UniProtKB/Swiss-Prot annotation:
One of its GO terms (cellular component) is cytosol. Belongs to the DNA mismatch repair MutS family. This protein is involved in the repair of mismatches in DNA. It is possible that it carries out the mismatch recognition step. This protein has a weak ATPase activity. InterPro entries: DNA_mismatch_repair_MutS (IPR005748), DNA_mismatch_repair_MutS-lik_N (IPR007695), DNA_mismatch_repair_MutS/MSH (IPR017261), DNA_mismatch_repair_MutS_C (IPR000432), DNA_mismatch_repair_MutS_clamp (IPR007861), DNA_mismatch_repair_MutS_core (IPR007696), DNA_mismatch_repair_MutS_N (IPR016151), DNA_mismatch_repair_MutS_sf (IPR036187). ATP binds at residues 617-624. This is DNA mismatch repair protein MutS.
Length: 861
């Protein structure tokens, strides 16, 4: 970016003006209005030319040096801004506010708006289906205050979070496009590594100033009513956001009306790894296809899609809210009521963001036309909602309301299909304002006046070739061929000489010209004034309109979930007090949609008698799908949705952990195994007896002995924590865990071989798998036949030279699947019975206790 300079004297007057403005925004690209172009100078020009793929040139000299520059036409601004914002750049728009005709020296200019990725509101610069968030942080490693603002909706929230781990998980959930941190924080903190991190002056986070600014914004005496009066760190962060928003928007922010206190205790917590692995709204490749939201989002409005995304990324533990949503979905399914509502909801559009632009006073004519259509659709929607008896839906209907006066005002004011901008007029209907109509009539009647004048002048002069016309440079004129110019009457005043013709003007035509051109500029000014007044009228009704938009978005989400329940065969889960997770015929909602063959549904049962399932079976057998579908079913239940299962009974969970698949973190300098162990450590430190834990192939990133040892110890620890755990592994040694851990059970995904080909059956059955089918999977993947044959030779030799694996009691039973013979990697470890025997305090035992212990030891053999 351009470095600030303090000495302007060597520069031309215009460049002095430029530098005075640029010094206030050294880190942002400045678009400097000059006539019909926005010009960009110096280092800004070099950067912009590269990013926008436009020509870099030079303009004259200033301070003895040529000025690098590039430029864009003013009417093409939005397209270039969209590209820069997507690249994470911020842009300062500097407009001419003085009159070039009357200015002495450079035309007066000032910064009118600042566009940053987190504060854009223009429709063209936003992703309509995703929140555009900006966040601010204050605190230290022990406690952080986090404030989050969506300027395009007015949603403003605060919370305080303990420790980096929880903070980074929350930032992963929110994914803000900008993150403001104090400039006096140490460098290279984890938060600063996020894209969009920006440092701000420490005084922007001053807590006392923040409290005053927030109270002034919300017109309250204090912040107690928002439940955040004691969150001093979060208040400091919120004050920084408010300052930043006002600085960039250069206007009041009436659509920011309240502050919401969010609490982690109210939600099901997912860390960053779990969120990525479950592919809630972004797949592992960074796209949106084949995600949970891509399957369950058929919302009619963009604002509802954004709300659904928030629900998916912030599942709740509030049973009252969840049951209200379930009741609403049942009601909407009854007699297929959602089918009547959805077409009407589609007419509403994205009024949430339209209202925000109205609050920011930058709403465009088409925004008002869409709001007019939405308000016009409300009465019919309200009539349909009167049939909905669910209490929560009745509340939404009451909040939605109707606005007949505003609908009538917009109907009278805005033409049916207005232009994109107010700049050139043509937005307001005839009859809306008499003075505007009179001014427009003068311009519109100019054509007839010229026809009449031409006829009169031909008759008066007898010159048949006389013409009356107009051009933008010279205005109105009477044109005569050169040969007839000498016959012009004495009141004809020569205006322009052309090849073969002369142009004149008369006092009458000059008077009309002054009136017509004045009327046009006055009409544009009058229409802009009326348009601004219309925005102010709408702003005075902003609070109830925003409440209505929020209610309509929720109604749209609930109607969508009802439609999905019907068409995806989803059923209502039942929350119970007893700690359990019981799923009958559960399915993976995304995989089911992409398969060309029927999905194989499976059961799952976890309760006080079984808290962990050791899952074995071949690769591609369905272990990961089985685990992920369990997590998605639990997550959907915790947003109030129906779930892909014949039935589901569960208690509230506090967290969902997934350790499924890993890759190198090259930027962070961490290997695959290091990433895997970091995720495992997070789970072991934070899982509780109310957590759902998915562990897939723990320990595979290191040597066999180390990996198996870590997997075994991690499984034991999770069993002791009593977390609901699905533990998939290829270490068959772990299938003996149920012998020493009574809350652990074995299940496996079955498969069979036919003509040396593997067939995956995808059924989950009790007990450990009978074999791994590793060579069959390798053959299926296309490994050369010669390699497969050689592998079979090695396998045979290994199996004959290795000790047979000790079979667990369940595996010895008749018809039970046999654990394959393979090296017992823990052959040198003491038997569980010997371990237990070594810990006994024999002198402290009674004879009866000794006999009971003897029986326990016998059962371990």
């Amino acid at each position: 970016m351009n470095k600030a300079i303090s000495d302007f004297t060597a520069h031309t007057p215009m460049m002095q003006q430029y530098w005075k403005l640029k010094n206030q925004h050294p880190d942002q690209l400045m678009f400097y209005r000059m006539g019909d172009f926005y010009e960009i100078f110096y280092e800004d020009a070099k950067k912009a030319a590269k990013l926008l793929d436009i020509t870099l040139t030079a303009r004259g000299q200033s301070a003895g040096q040529s000025i690098p520059m590039c430029g864009i036409p003013f009417h093409s601004l939005e397209g270039y801004l969209a590209k820069l914002v997507k690249l994470g750049e911020s842009v300062v728009i500097c407009e001419q506010i003085g009159d070039p005709a009357t200015s002495k020296g450079p035309v007066e200019r000032q910064v009118v708006r600042i566009i940053t990725p987190g504060t854009v509101s223009d429709e063209a610069l936003l992703d309509e289906r995703r929140d555009n968030l900006i966040a601010a942080l204050l605190g230290d490693e022990r406690l952080f205050g986090l404030a989050v603002l969506d300027i395009t909706s007015g949603n403003f929230s605060v919370q305080e979070i303990k420790g980096w781990e929880n903070l980074l998980a929350e930032l992963e959930r929110l994914n803000p496009v900008e993150l403001l941190i104090p400039d006096d924080w140490p460098r290279d903190l984890p938060a600063e590594k996020r894209p969009g991190a920006r440092r701000r002056a420490p005084w922007d986070f001053d807590r006392d100033s923040a409290r005053k600014a927030l109270c002034q914004q919300f017109a309250t005496k204090d912040l107690k009513g928002f439940g955040c009066d004691k969150l001093t760190l979060a208040i400091g962060a919120a004050g920084c956001l408010l300052t930043y928003a006002k600085e960039t928007q250069r206007t009041a922010l009436p659509h920011l009306r309240s502050l919401r206190h969010e609490r982690l205790d109210d939600t099901v917590i997912l860390d960053g790894a779990s969120r990525r692995n479950l592919e809630l709204d972004i797949n592992l490749a960074g796209g949106r296809d084949n995600t949970l939201q891509s399957v369950i989002d058929r919302c009619q409005t963009a604002m509802a899609s954004r709300l659904l995304s928030r629900w998916l990324n912030r599942p709740l533990r509030d049973l009252k809210v969840l049951q209200a949503r379930q009741d609403s979905i049942r009601c909407l399914l009854d007699s297929y009521r959602f089918e009547k509502l959805q077409p009407q909801l589609k007419e509403i559009g994205d009024i949430e963001r339209i209202l925000a632009r109205i609050g920011l006073r930058n709403a465009r004519p088409r925004d008002l036309a869409r709001l007019r259509d939405a308000l016009g659709a409300l009465p019919e929607l309200q009539n349909a909602m009167t049939e909905l008896e669910a209490p929560h839906l009745a509340r939404l209907a009451a909040i939605t309301g109707t606005y007949p006066e505003l609908a009538s005002l917009l109907e009278r004011a805005i033409i049916d299909n207005p232009p994109a901008v107010i700049r050139d007029g043509g937005v307001l209907k005839a009859g809306y304002d008499n003075e505007l109509d009179d001014l427009l009539a003068i311009s519109e009647n100019a054509g007839q006046f010229l026809i009449d004048l031409e006829a009169r002048e031909k008759a008066r002069t007898g010159l048949a070739n006389l013409k009356v016309g107009y051009n933008r440079v010279h205005g109105y004129f009477i044109e005569l061929p050169t040969k007839q110019a000498e016959q012009a009457p004495g009141d004809y005043i020569r205006r322009q000489t052309l090849k073969g013709a002369e142009r004149f003007i008369t006092p009458e035509l000059k008077a009309f010209e002054d009136k017509a051109l004045s009327a046009k500029s006055r009409a544009l000014a009058r229409e802009k004034m009326l348009y601004d007044a219309l925005l102010e009228t709408l702003i005075s009704h902003l609070a109830p309109l925003q409440d209505s938009a929020a209610a309509l978005a929720e109604l749209d989400v609930l109607s969508n979930l009802a439609e999905r329940a019907l068409n995806l065969d989803l059923n209502c889960p039942r929350f119970v007090d007893e700690p359990c997770l019981r799923i009958v015929q559960g399915r993976h909602p995304v995989v089911e949609q992409v398969l060309t063959t029927p999905f194989v549904a499976n059961d799952l049962g976890l309760d006080n008698s079984t808290r962990m399932l050791i899952i074995t079976g071949p690769n591609m057998g369905g272990k990961s799908t089985y685990m992920r579908q369990t997590a998605l079913i639990v997550l959907l239940a915790h947003i109030g949705s129906f779930v892909p299962a014949a039935s589901c009974e569960l208690s509230l969970v506090d967290r969902i952990f997934t350790r499924i698949g890993s890759s190198d973190d090259l930027a962070g300098g961490r290997s695959t195994f290091m990433v895997e162990m970091s995720e495992t450590a997070n789970i072991l430190h934070n899982a509780t007896d109310r957590s759902l834990v998915l562990m897939d192939e723990v320990g595979r990133g290191t040597s066999t002995f180390d990996g198996l040892s870590l997997a075994w110890a991690a499984a034991e620890r999770l069993a002791q924590l009593r977390a609901y755990t699905l533990f998939a592994t290829h270490y068959f040694e772990l299938t003996v865990l149920p012998e020493s851990e009574p809350l652990v059970a074995n299940v496996h995904l079955n498969a069979t071989e036919h003509n040396e080909r593997i067939v995956f059956l995808h059924h989950v059955l009790p007990g450990p798998a009978s074999q791994s089918y590793g060579l069959a999977v390798a053959q299926l993947a296309g490994v050369p036949t010669v390699v497969i044959q050689r592998a079979r030779e090695h396998l045979g030799r290994l199996e004959t030279t290795s000790l047979p694996h000790e079979q667990p009691p369940a595996a010895k039973a008749k018809d039970a699947p046999q654990v394959p013979h393979q090296s017992d990697l823990f052959a040198s470890l003491p038997h569980p019975a010997i371990e237990k025997l070594g810990k006994l305090q024999l002198d402290d035992m009674t004879p009866r206790q000794a006999i009971e212990m003897l029986y326990q030891l016998k059962n371990l053999l």
